[in-house]
Amino acid sequence: MVIRSQVGGDQLNLLARGWLLAARGQFIPYGNPMSTGGKAPGGITTVLVGLPLMLWRDHRAPAVLVLLFHIAAYWLLDGALKRHLAPRERVLLALLYWLNPWQLFFATFLWNPNYLFFFGSLHLWSALAQRERARFWPSFLHVAGLVLAFQIHPSCLLLVVASGLLWLRRFFRVHWPGAILGGLAAALPLIPWALEVITHPAIVTAAKKGFLGRGLLYGLPRGVSYWLRYASLSVSWRLDDFNFSEILGGSDRWLGPGLHLLATTVLGLTVLFPLLANLRLWRVRKRLPVAPGRLARLRAWGLAVWRRRLVPGTTGRAWVKGYVRICFVAGLIVFSLSPTTVMMWQGVILFHAAILPVVLWAGPLARTRLAARTIRWSRVYLVAEVVFLIAIAFGTPYYRCAGHKPEDSFNFNLKYDSPMFRELNIQQTCPWPMNVPGGWWPDVLPPG
């Protein structure tokens, strides 16, 4: 999938920053344009894209680093949870995390949100490592990860809010000298950005689109749906936009549309599994005497969940369950306050937490009378994942050159030309229309 990965508008903006650093030694101290306007703070994306291009002058080099970030994310997550999950549950973790079409889609091409999976796993690991006592390096890495993630994508606010709630509920302790030093070290890339803001304040003041709380009106259900869909085969956006004309050598009249229909119907039903798992995770077993009325019952249930189910348990497994609940609450808060409509990539930093309810629910089922059925369904799910991944690798817009639509953000008209397109093998892989009046152009790439 890395070899077949293509570049669109966002990728060209990122590659322009990395290429200018690798080829011309020019450091761009700010990131890609944001959906709310302005530029992302800090030049960490320039470094993340530029360093791989120094080793391999190809547009797929940064995607290799993205894949390494995802490998490290899974290794860190599995290492953190191996003492708290049964062997079969670790197999489910591999099935639902590593072989997940959502995860492998984000793991194999260049994009800002694709780096965030690692910071999500780092967040869980560093918090769990301080469940009983504060430690220097976990606190250092916890805060450093938050600050670096902030410079990559603003959706890191999900982890920031989760950290605050975890700390308030005493899910982890903080080694304050380590936390402060971690924040200062990770903030070093912000110094050139701050100097640039003084000279060109428009990169900050341009961020005026949307309004605080828009998510409560438009996007909260979307955010919750993505939380559930991350642990399923119910994909969205362009993951099911299949077109195999490039492979078939002609038009694709039935295979792509047929798989799209299958993905939106049969595979879409797999979201029922994470829905049931999340309902079980939030279940309150003991009924409390409450006053009549729906509002009173809802309030009593909320208090019971918060007081009983979100306090740290005596076991690591109870801690993990509480961590997942708090991440979900953090998602509700941030999605509600979001100034823009919640999109699928804005929640992937919580991907590691979103898949855990199914692991914690299906794992114990394998030790009951439903064991044979659970194993059988897991094998069916594995086959469906592998087939779906092959279809994504050969049929979706990010992994094919032919059959693009205008809304795909691929191969649209470019206003100028640049040596970058040939040095990074972009034109050799999938050529773009160049020197078209009225076309688009990467924000920092000089023409010519």
Regions found by a protein language model. Give the residues of each.
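Extracytosolic helix-loop segments that constitute the early lumenal/periplasmic catalytic or substrate-binding loops
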Residues: 12-47, 55, 214-218
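Transmembrane-helix motifs of polytopic, lipid-linked glycan transferases
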Residues: 64-85, 122, 272-277
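Membrane-interface transmembrane helices that cradle and orient dolichyl/undecaprenyl
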Residues: 84-87, 121-141, 149
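Short helix- or helix-capping micro-motifs
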Residues: 93-99, 146, 150
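Short acidic/glycine- and proline-prone juxtamembrane loop motifs at membrane-interface regions
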Residues: 102-115
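Hydrophobic/aromatic-rich transmembrane helices and adjacent perimembrane loops
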Residues: 106-107, 158, 321-370
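Transmembrane-lumen/periplasm boundary regions of multi-pass, lipid-linked membrane glycan transferases
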Residues: 160-273, 278-281
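Signature aromatic-anchored transmembrane alpha helix within multi-pass, membrane-resident enzymes
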Residues: 183, 187, 362-400
